[in-house]
Each structure stands twice: as structure tokens, then as C-alpha cells.
């Protein structure tokens, strides 16, 4: 039996604590670039410390969200491009709280992997810090777990938690939505972070396409198209004058069909005109290759619309000018469902 170096039994079992400490210590300076004066304490403490400044907010409401990236990670791992999925995670979480009217305060990440690869970890932290700086939130903490008995070689998973704040009187909950209000769609740049299990089945398994392949109709090689970074809509939403947005829906894993109803009053329907915008070619490719129904496409994918804002006709022109969005439908009397036209 091979003799195990004293103190290295855990490393021989697949968990190298010393390597983890060295890698994380080397990236502390990058993480600090996301800090403002609100962040207290040092990196690596048992808990992240954040001195919230709620000046100008009479009744602050904290808003939280947690999410993952899903099987988009399979594409990142296959191509060795990892920073983008870290950005995806931050932006997805920011959008999820932006629909309530909240602005982000801080973000925490979780990385679980078969082993800690310094190159992969460096790219992930680069992506997290880039998106946090762009989103004006601090990367206040995280957890990195080496789990050789859980993940296959080279695999990892990501999750993220975000905390934001909004004035209670400014919460967006859809309660002010009425028939005749308009739906303004903000464009996505691709799949964002959902539908990748189906997309991979169709594009890679059924159609036998290669991630490095240039496919007719796509602006980039297939893999790069699939790794386009999830857009962050919070800043443009925050630029719209107070009160003009009546409700907002982040269009992710249930598509327009499942996610618009989350903000509809019980007596309202959303009538979506699907011919009012151009569906990106990647979705058409998936639909044709997989022989997928229109209904299912709009329930799995965002189909080119990453965020929907509900506004009155009075404010629509100003919101359109500010967001570069498109009117994609309207609110009608109904029972809380979405109708595709």
C-alpha cells in the first residue's frame, strides 16, 4: 500500500485544502474590486459583513433570490470558456430582483467541483467580479467545495444568491396592471440561461452539430452563440421614471407562457403578438432541428424577449425611447393567462 504523506490523507482522497487556500488567496485582490465602503471585515471570514446605507428610503424592503446556470455549464466546460457562465449567474439573479423594483446590494457564489482547477476558478472569479462591478453589487462571500465523489472529472456546478433593496411604496407587484396597458419587450441576445438541456439534445445529439462549427444563419460559431452572456436589465429599468412601470417579468425557464402570468391580476390576460419582433436564428434552428411545436418553444425558451415591462399607453413612448424595446402586446380582460397571437 502506498504510504500517504503525513497530513495529506485528505488530498489523496481528492480534496486538496492547501491548493484551495492558495488559489483563493491569490484572487482576493480581484474580489476586493467589487467592494464599496459598505463592505466590512476581511475576505474569508465566517460571514460577509455589509453596512447597508438606506438613506432616502423610508421603509426599506430586502429582496433575495437564488439561482443556478443549469446545463449551459456543459457548453462552457466543453469549450474551456468559464467566465461567461459566472456573468450569466450574476446577471440572472440581478434581473430576478429587478422585477420587484429592487437594486442589488451584494452577491454570494457557490462553486462545487470534482476538484479545484486553478485556471477554471480564475475564469469564474473573473466573470463574477466583472458582472458584480457592472451591476454595482459587492461579491461579499462564497463557498468552494471539492467533491470528487459527486462530480465527474472536469465537472462543476454554480449557484448564486443575491440580496437587494427597494422602498416598500415602490415595489412592483403587478397590482396596478389594467386592461389596455401595453407589453414592452426588451430583447435577449440568445438563450440566456435556460433551455440548454433541450438545445443540446437537438443541436448536438440529434443534428450532430459541432460547437466550433459555423452554422448558416448564426453570427458566431455554434458554441459562442450558446455562450452569449445573459443580459442585465436592471440599469435600464432603474432609469425609467418612478411609477411608469406597473409590472415586470424576467423571461427565463417557463418562457412567456409561464412567466407573464406571475405578474397578471386575476382579471387580466396578456395578449402577445409574436410577429412584433424578430425571433433570433438560434431559436429557429432548435425548433426546426427538433421538430418542436410553437407552443412548447414559447414555454421553454425566451424566444428573443428577455424582460417584459407593463406600462400604460400614456407612458409607452417614453419607455420605448429609454429602453430600445418593442411593443409586443397588450393587457386584456381575462383570467390571468397568456394568449399568443
Predicted regions and their residues:
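N-terminal amphipathic/basic leader segments beginning at the initiator methionine
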Residues: 2-38
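Glycine-/charge-enriched secondary-structure boundary and capping motifs
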Residues: 2-12, 120-138, 151-158, 207-212, ...
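A generic structural signal for residues located within well-ordered alpha-helices
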Residues: 15, 19, 85, 194, ...
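Residue-level signature of catalytic and energy-coupling elements of molecular machines
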Residues: 16, 67, 180, 250, ...
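Short, acidic Gly/Pro/Ser/Thr-rich loop/turn segments
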Residues: 20, 56-57, 69-72, 167-170, ...
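Predominant activation on well-ordered alpha-helical scaffold segments within soluble catalytic domains
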Residues: 21-28, 46-50, 60, 91, ...
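Glycine-rich phosphate/pyrophosphate-binding loop regions near the starts of catalytic domains
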Residues: 29-30, 35-189
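Short, acidic (Asp/Glu-rich) active-site segment that either coordinates a divalent metal cofactor
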Residues: 66, 157, 170-222, 257
Amino acid at each position: 500500500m502506498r504510504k500517504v504523506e503525513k497530513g495529506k490523507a485528505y488530498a489523496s482522497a481528492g480534496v486538496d485544502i492547501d491548493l484551495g487556500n492558495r488559489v483563493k488567496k491569490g484572487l482576493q485582490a480581484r474580489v476586493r474590486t467589487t467592494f464599496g465602503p459598505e463592505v466590512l471585515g476581511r475576505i474569508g471570514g465566517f460571514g460577509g459583513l455589509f453596512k447597508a446605507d438606506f438613506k432616502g428610503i423610508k421603509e426599506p424592503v430586502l429582496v433575495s433570490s437564488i439561482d443556478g446556470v443549469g446545463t449551459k455549464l456543459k457548453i462552457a466546460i466543453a469549450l474551456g470558456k468559464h467566465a461567461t457562465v459566472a456573468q450569466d449567474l450574476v446577471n440572472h439573479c440581478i434581473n430576478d430582483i429587478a422585477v420587484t423594483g429592487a437594486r442589488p446590494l451584494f452577491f454570494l457564489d457557490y462553486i462545487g467541483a470534482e476538484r479545484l482547477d486553478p485556471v477554471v476558478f480564475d475564469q469564474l472569479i473573473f466573470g463574477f467580479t466583472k458582472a458584480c462591478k457592472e451591476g454595482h453589487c459587492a461579491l461579499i462571500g462564497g463557498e468552494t467545495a471539492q467533491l470528487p465523489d459527486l462530480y465527474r472529472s472536469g465537472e462543476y456546478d454554480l449557484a448564486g444568491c443575491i440580496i437587494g433593496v427597494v422602498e416598500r411604496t415602490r415595489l412592483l407587484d403587478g397590482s396596478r396592471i389594467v386592461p389596455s396597458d401595453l407589453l414592452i419587450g426588451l430583447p435577449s441576445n440568445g438563450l440566456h440561461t435556460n433551455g440548454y438541456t433541450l438545445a443540446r439534445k437537438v443541436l448536438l445529439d440529434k443534428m450532430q452539430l459541432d460547437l466550433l462549427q459555423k452554422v448558416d444563419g448564426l453570427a458566431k460559431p455554434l458554441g459562442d452563440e450558446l455562450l452569449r452572456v445573459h443580459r442585465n436589465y436592471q440599469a435600464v429599468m432603474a432609469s425609467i421614471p418612478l411609477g411608469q412601470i406597473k409590472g415586470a417579468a424576467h423571461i427565463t425557464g417557463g418562457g412567456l407562457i409561464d412567466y407573464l402570468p406571475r405578474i397578471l391580476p386575476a382579471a387580466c390576460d396578456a395578449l402577445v403578438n409574436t410577429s412584433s419582433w424578430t425571433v433570433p436564428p438560434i431559436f429557429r434552428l432548435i425548433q426546426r432541428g427538433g421538430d418542436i411545436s410553437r407552443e412548447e418553444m414559447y414555454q421553454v425558451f425566451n424566444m428573443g424577449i428577455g424582460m417584459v415591462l407593463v406600462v400604460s399607453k400614456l407612458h409607452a413612448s417614453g419607455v420605448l425611447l429609454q429602453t430600445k424595446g418593442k411593443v409586443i402586446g397588450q393587457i386584456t380582460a381575462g383570467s390571468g393567462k397568456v394568449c399568443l397571437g
